[in-house]
Amino acid sequence: MDRISSAAEQALAPQVALAAAPATGPLHKLIKVAVSCVPWLIIGGLLWAGLFIKPQPVGGTVQPPVIERRDHFFGLAAAPAGGIWVAGSSGKIVSIGADGRIERMSTPTDQTLQDIAVWDAQRAVAVGNDGVVLTTADGGKRWTKVDGIPRSEVANKLTRVRVATGGRAVATGEMGALLQSTDFGATWSRLRDEEDVAWNDAALLAEGQVVAVGEFGRILRSTDGGASWQEPASGVESSLMAVAFRNANEGVAVGLEGVVLVSRDGGASWQRAESGAQAHLFDIAWDEANQRWLGAGALGSWVTAAADAAGWRAGRVDERDLAWHTRVLPAGKDAWFAGANIGRWDGQRWAALAGH
């Protein structure tokens, strides 16, 4: 037994000695070099991937909706082909077709647009913050920014634009801005010198008559296209926000604190009417189809009266909707409202557009 163990130990001794001997051969050196290079190979591979491999998107690109919840739309006009155009935040002009299709037009500005008006099937104009004026001559396919707009060194927001036949337009705004164009918005000039008052709206009547309303209850009237002006008393100190006429004589102006003024002599004199509204009123329109006046304002407010502008009634488009509206546009039996949201009201039911 001892001899067997001894023989086994002798047989294993060379192998143990071989295993215990230090590995200093060429193969071992090659292995060490290869192992030491592994981290650098990994780092190099990551750098190459970062520089030269471009990740590919999976699935389609998510496009934001045309009308987003954060959008406000201050201007509203009947579109040439039916439906409406609205103008507002970030230079947006949006077409809402009679079939409900909603499309954003391409515009060359990010300035908020305050109003939009349409002459005919091809030509329209929009105005807004910092004196921006845009025009189109192809039905809204392309909008062009107009240069050379008269500017103030203080403030230049244009809040409203009204148009009339023959390419005439008047834009109102801060620092006494009353600007006129007679060539479909291509060029503009001042109707009055700059002053520290905001004119909020103007009505263009026949034969060169202009009636403008603004801050502090001020009213201006011209019968010669702006060559000379009269300032009839309004009897109120609240800022007047909008004015409209249904013919050469009968007009209505509305303003803050529910103010409603009525004129029956082309704006030469004004009388206050009891509107029944407590909220601010921002717009007034004559609804020819329904032979009524219709106004819009804060907290979803509306006011209305018959053609004689007497017996005013007030209410809200929806008790659950407290959005303010700066524009109202009669449309058949219904009316469009635009402001903090856009919606259609039939006198009973309010339907806000998706996204608002």
For each feature predicted by the language model, list its residue ranges.
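Residue-level hotspots at or immediately adjacent to binding/recognition sites across diverse folds
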Residues: D2-H356
